[in-house]
Structures are given as structure tokens and as C-alpha cells.
Amino acid sequence: MSSNFDKFQKRRLISSYFSVVLSVFLVLFLLGVLGLFIINSKKLADDFKEKIAMTVFFKNEANDSIIKAFNSELKRAPFALSYVYVTKEKAAKEHTDIIGEDFLTFLGENPLLNSYDIHLKADYVERDSILKIESALRKNTMIEDIVYDKQLVNLVNDNIKKVSMWILIISGFLTVIAVLLINSSLRLSIHSNRFIIKTMQMVGATKSFIRKPFVMRSVKLGMLGALLAIIALIGLLFYVETNFPGLGILEDKALIGLVLLAVFGLGVLITWVSTHFATQRFLNLRTDDLY
């Protein structure tokens, strides 16, 4: 009879441990996926921003020395990611290729201007930053005009802000759910040991002494769940990289490592905090309340 009871207790204990590891694994895996999505969504947003070009047109009076001086200025400019000089002849050829007709034959002259196509760094593709850059460039009296898609810049930045806000809301919601799920699993695990906790307290053991083995065990289970989540996340990363190489999901290894480290840290932190408060709850209960 005693043997059967011991087997039952052992099975219940294993089941309790398994539920803790599983809940930690699932929750941290979801949070890890969200973290990886956040760092890659910023990368995708930056890539899109850096594709928006600003075109600087020069007056016909601008000679080669002025063009070269402007080129040197761009080399030193902190906002310039890349730039290409487009001569009026090259621009005319491109227009001819697009419309399929040589417009120079009936115009008699080339009305186009020499220009620079400038791609800005993502941090500078903001409404205020671009206006400052435009204002600074217009001080050059040889510049005829500066053209870029203002509506697209505003639209991109507004949408990025909206997406970022929703990501933060979802992250906060998932974090709360994570803590509640893991906390619930740990409380159920400790609940089965409530009489042991109270017995140890009655024979004079200090609260910290009673808490220690439960906290250590839960932290180990949290570490196991976190490691399983990290393995699953690494597998997911390689799967995405293999099937969608164009995304370049493995390029920023430092940030990926930071996300994986955060997943492991959360596994330890959440289980430690949850177990601490769960054991404290049973330590504060009266003996009659244990039943």
C-alpha cells in the first residue's frame, strides 16, 4: 500500500515538474519569437527607409569643380549612406529608355539637369531631420532644386510608430501572461509540498532555509525550460534563414545573442520570483488553512 502511494506521489511530482518546464518553454519561446521579430522588424524598417532617395539638382552654371566640392561634402556628411552622380546625358538616356522615344530629337536640347541621388541613413529619414538637411543643402547657391517623396517619408514614419506601439502592447501583454502561467504552474507544484513547508516551520526552520530548496529546484526547472526555448529558437532561425535567405535574419548575431540571453535570464528570474512568493504564501498560512 505504501509502495503504491509512493509511486503515485512520484508520478504526481514528475507531472508537476513537467508542467513547469513545459509552461516555461512555451512562454519563453513565444517571447523569444516576439523579440526576434522586433529586432528584425527594425532592420526591415531601416532597409525600407534607406531606399528612399533624395535628389539634388544643380544649375547649368555648376561646373566640375563645384560638383567635386559637393561630392567631398557628401563624403564627410554623417547623414549620407550612399550617393550617385547622374549627369544630364545619363538622365536623358534613362528617360528615353523609359518612354521608348528619343525626346531630345523634337526638343532640340537637353532640359534635364545634373544631379545627385542621395540615400540617407535610416536615422535621418525623419520629417525634422530631412528638413534640416534640405535647409543646409539649399545654402549652396548652385543647387537648383531638392526633390524627395515627402508623403512617403511621413507615411513610413507614421506606420512604423503605430507598429512599434502595438508591438510594445503585445509584448507587455505576453509578459504578463508569461508570469501568470509560470506562477500558476509553480504554485501548483509547491502546493503539494505545503505540509512539508509547514512542518519544517513548526520545528524551527527559518523562512529562508525553507524557501531555498524550492527556489533552487524551480530555478533549475526554469533554466531547463529556457534552454529548450533557446534550442527551439535557434532551430527556427536556421529554418527561416534556409528557406528565406533574402531576409538576412542571421546577420545581426550580437542582437540575436542578446535576445537568447534575455530568454535565459527571464526563465531564471520569473521562476525565482514566483517560487519565492509562492512559498512565502504557504509560510504565512495558519495550519488550519492548509486543508
UniProtKB/Swiss-Prot annotation:
Please give, as recorded in its UniProt entry, the membrane topology of this protein: Multi-pass membrane protein
Disrupted gene: phenotype observed: Filamentous cell morphology and multiple septa. Filaments cross walls but cells fail to separate. Gliding motility defects. Resistant to infection by a number of F.johnsoniae bacteriophages.
Gene3D superfamilies recorded for this chain?
A: 3.30.70.3040
Mind giving the lineage of the organism this protein is from? Bacteria, Pseudomonadati, Bacteroidota, Flavobacteriia, Flavobacteriales
| Family affiliation | Belongs to the ABC-4 integral membrane protein family. FtsX subfamily.
| Entry protein name | Cell division protein FtsX
Biological function: Required for cell division and gliding motility.
User: PANTHER family attached here?
Assistant: CELL DIVISION PROTEIN FTSX
Record topological domains on the Periplasmic side = 40-162, 242-253
The record's keywords, sorted A to Z, are: Cell cycle, Cell division, Cell inner membrane, Cell membrane, Membrane, Transmembrane, Transmembrane helix
Q: Which residues cross the membrane?
A: 19-39, 163-183, 221-241, 254-274
Could you tell me where this protein is found in the cell?
Cell inner membrane
Q: Which residues lie on this side of the membrane: Cytoplasmic?
A: 1-18, 184-220, 275-291
- Write out the GO cellular component annotations: Gram-negative-bacterium-type cell wall; plasma membrane
What's an example Gene Ontology biological process for this entry? cell gliding
